Amino acid sequence: MKKINYILAVILTISSFGTFAQSQKINTEKSTINWLGKKIGGQHEGLINIKSGELEEKGGKIVSGSFVIDMTSITNTDLTDASYNQKLVGHLKSDDFFGIEKFPTANLNITKATKFSNGKASVTGDVTIKGKTETITFDIVKKGNSYSAKIEIDRSKHNVRFGSTSFFDSLGDKAIDDLFILDIKLVVS
């Protein structure tokens, strides 16, 4: 009888490990954020670094997550002319766009998620850019110790006004799409 009780205690102890949340730090060296912004007649793209972050999983779903994005690290990868590249990056860092002197970071905080099914889940979270917060929902894919997501963000919700038809009329071919895309690859350790 003691042996059966001991075996049951061991089984219960082992099975209870699966119910605890597992916190995982984001490996900022291996994780990437590619951005894409479109305008009439073209587009630009580049990279932004993740400063810090973590994900917490429990029972096959993300229960929380927070990420700090280093807006001072924004780069452009499609312009090969150094002068034009510098000009664009400087403009993106200026108050016309992300105002990095006042807002050096952006944040994403996951508030809820569905359970992973075939490696995919739906995530809802709050994204804060330039001090303005918007709730967004997006799909995330998990493969091993990495996660990927493509997130569309409406810059007009974050007071990023330059070239936006949401704020200015008669921009014609100078208009820049309000939506920009973040293609995120997270590696946890």
Which ranges hold each PLM region?
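Bacterial Sec-dependent N-terminal signal peptides
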Residues: 1-24
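Low-complexity, acidic/polar, glycine-enriched regions of mature
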Residues: 21-189
